[in-house]
């Protein structure tokens, strides 16, 4: 058996680097956090080959004293904490004192720093084993990391393409810029400016990273509970993304990724967005540092909350309440060109007209008396016309107004006090039915049923049979009942609201979907998804013609429905075109 030996310091640092330094973005994270902890508000980052050849960061922070420079590259040397109590209430981004030592062990690192009280700067290059030397540098620090992983080639093989590594760096800088203000960070690669994030205020930083569209398609939230404060912006349920790269969550200004928080946010958006879409948000949670453990992971990206359930419930309830009170925004219209509208091009000679044309030639020339009579009639002034009395226009105070008609049997057009409302009648009806189903289940625990005059037979697949055996009792709470004769499933009752729907297709889909939710803890989610699909089956369809009274009833129901701004899949249910937008469409007032 091999003897147990102490590892050399260089190898210890390289092992530590394996936990902390995964890629160039990991290096950037550590040195940027050190700069922020030093009070820097302006950072300039330069890279080459997406950071594998060069990472250089200059800041305007407080700098490092000469006598501390060498110690800064020593393992577990830090100015951030002194005791266990400090660790349990740490508020700085860095605190372990191992980042610089780890970085220097796998790269060629040079650090130059100057404090306000120093006459000049001092420079140190650990890989050269040279003494600290004087240098020219304004107050602040510049750290230069060259040839990352030069002495650990196996690690270098795991790096991705320059494009991917650069993407990770830009994502990191976006998150850091969002976390504080005033703050500005720029990124250059080979003398080319890649980005500049930040601003004098948090909203300026938000705009620089997320853009104007996010500000227009999000709501700002503020909530407090038992010492926790939540602030930020969440995207509308109709404004989502295919990936999760537009999600930023900060705990005490530290960008983190937490499963507990992710679950709370996802649950808050449940039944408002499509399952394959992801919400966009920038959220800041502030709480006592003693209530969150930031020392749970080497990269400090994951945290542990000491009151996990309380934190989860606070996040969920705050977001859920805000999201369900959202009203759709005014429609975003593409500006019209000032040029005259283009008329349809004339048809070719072979084109067939839609209507029979009146001949332009006469069978005979008009007689003289006919021509004279026409001339006299044309010269006679028209009789005076008394205008018909106009009905008094009543002010429309209903939020969604009064229905005017349908477009293509798909959209309801209504007029309200602000202007024009356009409603997607299927999406709107779907949301109405969904909330009604949920309300009945919540209050009565049993959906009203309709017994079928003619029971409907259905041949079940093995998967559907298993679902029926496992969840049969629960299915009956949704309003379904059945009997089985000679292995044939015969449907006897359905939810009363589905009596006019394709019940065979619905029950088949329900049983199939239940196979995807085998755990009892997931039944709530399964129930909501199944109800959503049932409502989708029952809701009015495109090209269903409704009377004006039916349209108005749908509008009134929608006005009293929670989360009425979008259907269960995240599509808008209605949009508002105000008078200003309508004027702009016709170039009025220009």
Swiss-Prot record:
GO terms for biological process: mismatch repair. PROSITE patterns: DNA_MISMATCH_REPAIR_1. Gene3D superfamilies: 3.30.230.10, Histidine kinase-like ATPase, C-terminal domain, MutL, C-terminal domain, dimerisation subdomain, MutL, C-terminal domain, regulatory subdomain. This is DNA mismatch repair protein MutL. Residues 335-354 are annotated as: Disordered. GO terms for molecular function: ATP binding; ATP hydrolysis activity; ATP-dependent DNA damage sensor activity; mismatched DNA binding. InterPro entries: DNA_mismatch_repair_CS (IPR014762), DNA_mismatch_repair_MutL (IPR020667), DNA_mismatch_S5_2-like (IPR013507), HATPase_C_sf (IPR036890), MutL/Mlh/PMS (IPR002099), MutL/Mlh/Pms-like (IPR038973), MutL_C (IPR014790), MutL_C_dimsub (IPR042120). SUPFAM superfamilies: ATPase domain of HSP90 chaperone/DNA topoisomerase II/histidine kinase, DNA mismatch repair protein MutL, Ribosomal protein S5 domain 2-like. Keywords: DNA damage, DNA repair. Belongs to the DNA mismatch repair MutL/HexB family. This protein is involved in the repair of mismatches in DNA. It is required for dam-dependent methyl-directed DNA mismatch repair. May act as a 'molecular matchmaker', a protein that promotes the formation of a stable complex between two or more DNA-binding proteins in an ATP-dependent manner without itself being part of a final effector complex. One of its GO terms (cellular component) is mismatch repair complex.
